[in-house]
Amino acid sequence: MRDFIFRKKNVVSQEDCDKIIDFFESNPNSHLQGTVGSEEKLVPSDKISTEILLNVTHCNSLNEIIWKAMTQSVEEYKKIFPFLDSGVRRWEVNTIMKIQRYKPGEGYFVEHCENAGFSGESVGGDKRMMAWMIYFNEERDSGYTEFPTQ
């Protein structure tokens, strides 16, 4: 069985990666503490992170960088799995994005799955069929993402 995980190295240039990190660090008033579950609870024993939520419909250069990388990758993914365009009902990429930072010692410490999305989200996250991530660092010694069933 295929694992359905699509990996694409260097999907964002180093210059654009630096822009995204600079944006994150320069906007502390937009920082949120990482929450868990569709009820968005703070549970430090489960997750500790800093996050910013973005909506690509509020056009700025940062959103354009991420949206372009993500939508191009989705198109490549659909070529590998063409049933996504023919065997399922109409679907779309949600315009809400989350940028997360985990400092050393922080993380999402429990197994979890993508769930109902963010509060007030117009597209129901409960109907989510795919999730995507872009990593902006090379940290491998003390951080990782595990997909236990893949």
Regions found by a protein language model. Give the residues of each.
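Fe(II)/2-oxoglutarate oxygenase catalytic core
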Residues: 1-150
